[in-house]
Every structure is written in C-alpha cells, then in structure tokens.
C-alpha cells in the first residue's frame, strides 16, 4: 500500500502542475493583475489543480505513515513520468523518443533500486538528539545555499536555490511522517499539542516560497532536475539519520542499487532537458501539398 499511495501522490502532483499551468496560459484575453487572479479563481481547471494538490498531500501522508521514507520519496520522482503522459494524452504534445526512453529508464532503475537495496527497519520514536542534529544540519545547509544563490548568473542561482528547495522538501516529508504518527497516536486535538504539525507548517511555507523564487531566477531546465534529484538523496540520508532505516548488507546488492540510483538520476536529468519546454499543444501536422501535374 505505501508504494501505491506514493505513486498516487506523484500522479496527483503531476495533475496539479499540468492543470494549473494549462489554466494559467489559457486566458484568451491575456488579462493581468487582479483581473488575471479573478480569471484563475473562477477557472474550474485551475481550482481542480488545487484539489489534485490536496490529494497529493493526503496520499503522501498515507504513504509516509505506512511506509519508509527511503522508499516513498524516491518514488515521487515518477511525477515527471506521469506529467509526460498527461502532456501527451491531454495536451497532445509531441514527445521526443529520447524523452520516452528516459522516462522508461527512470521507472526501471527506480524499481531496481528499491528491490535491490531492500530498505527496512525504522524507528517510530526517534531520539531528541537525532531530531535536533538532523534538522539543525539541514536547515543550516538550506540557509547557506540560499544565501549563495542570491547572487551570480541565472544558471548558478537556479542550481543553488533548487538544491536548497529540494532539501527543504525532504525536511517537509520528514515532518509529514512525524505529524501523521502524532495524529494516529494522540488524535486531531492531541496533534496540535505536539511540535511536528507546526514544524510542517513553517517548513512547508518556506519550501513553497523558496520554490517560487527558484522558478523565477533561472532556467527551469536547471532547477527542476536539481530539485528532483537532490530530494530523494537527502530523504534517504534523513531516513537513516532520524528514523534509523537500514538497507541490505550484501555488498553486491548495494552496489547494484547504487548504480541503479545513479542511472535514475541521469535519466531524470535527460527527461527534464528533452521534454517540451512549455505546456503549449503541439501544432497539427500539415501534410505537404501535392503539386499539380
């Protein structure tokens, strides 16, 4: 079930991106300012995107509560694959063959990584020392990367801020898992008497704000692969650091899983770089005219 919930979360995220972006560029009057905002909030497609986003959060929470962080977060990479399918079937974009091959390789290597690494274990009650050390280290790393990303060329800024954003999203996943545990243990009322729900609210808000800044400072072809690749790497590190999750002790299996993970990262980068740069539908094919005899 955790794997199914994680895939549903990835699909819902892809649905959110495609629907809201399609709605935002589909205004026939090209309104600006408050008129554009009014157009969006009255657009059923844009509102449906928010429903999809809420569904993504619920599915991710269910996956993290019932499964391992080191399994759930890497599976969210499939958002790019789902988005590609939606763009082809719904928006009717023409997708290059290399992009489809990259998507297929992403799925295969992801499955190979999870099956060969054999993630297991996990401590449902991490120690205070683990929480403080992990959160302080990741928060400090986010701050350093964000400060370095304030200046420089657009590509450099997009890469640095993208890395900072992805680390924050990994931290958000950790807090989601902790919050669901307190919810089940203490109920809705008791959840608000414990810190994870507030840590989630603050980190989630900061992650979204930093994500918006990242999207505006540099090319998406740089920031998107960084965010998608760094998030599962940091999540796996935090799964071991905080929740004491373990992996196979067999050297061969670990070697294969590491190679599969590296190949997955490469395929994700290729997918992001070769996918259509916009959500605009591909123009219809025009058959060449037959010259008169």
Predicted regions and their residues:
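Polytopic alpha-helical membrane proteins, predominantly small-molecule transporters/carriers
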Residues: 1-293
């Amino acid at each position: 079930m955790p794997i199914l919930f994680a895939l549903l979360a990835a699909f819902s995220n892809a649905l959110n991106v495609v629907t809201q972006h399609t709605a935002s560029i589909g205004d026939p009057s090209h309104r600006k300012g408050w008129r554009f905002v009014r157009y969006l909030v009255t657009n059923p497609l844009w509102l449906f995107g928010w429903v999809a986003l809420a569904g993504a959060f619920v599915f991710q929470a269910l996956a993290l509560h019932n499964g391992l962080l080191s399994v759930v977060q890497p599976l969210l990479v499939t958002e790019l694959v789902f988005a590609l399918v939606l763009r082809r079937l719904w928006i009717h974009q023409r997708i290059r063959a290399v992009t489809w091959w990259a998507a297929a390789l992403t799925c295969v290597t992801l499955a190979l990584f999870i099956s060969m690494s054999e993630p297991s274990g996990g401590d449902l009650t991490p120690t205070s020392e683990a929480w403080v050390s992990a959160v302080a280290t990741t928060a400090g790393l986010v701050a350093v990367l964000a400060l370095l990303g304030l200046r420089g060329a657009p590509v450099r800024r997009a890469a640095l801020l993208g890395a900072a954003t992805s680390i924050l999203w990994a931290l958000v996943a950790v807090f989601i898992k902790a919050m669901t545990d307190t919810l089940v243990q203490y109920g809705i009322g008791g959840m608000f008497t414990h810190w994870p729900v507030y840590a989630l609210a603050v980190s989630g808000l900061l992650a979204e704000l930093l994500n918006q800044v990242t999207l505006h400072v540099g090319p998406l072809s740089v920031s998107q692969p960084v965010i998608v690749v760094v998030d599962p790497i940091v999540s796996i590190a935090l799964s071991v650091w905080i929740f004491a999750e373990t992996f196979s002790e067999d050297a061969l299996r670990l070697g294969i899983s590491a190679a599969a993970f590296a190949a997955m990262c490469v395929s994700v980068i290729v997918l992001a770089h070769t996918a259509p740069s916009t959500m605009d539908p591909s123009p219809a094919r025009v058959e060449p005219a037959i010259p008169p005899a």
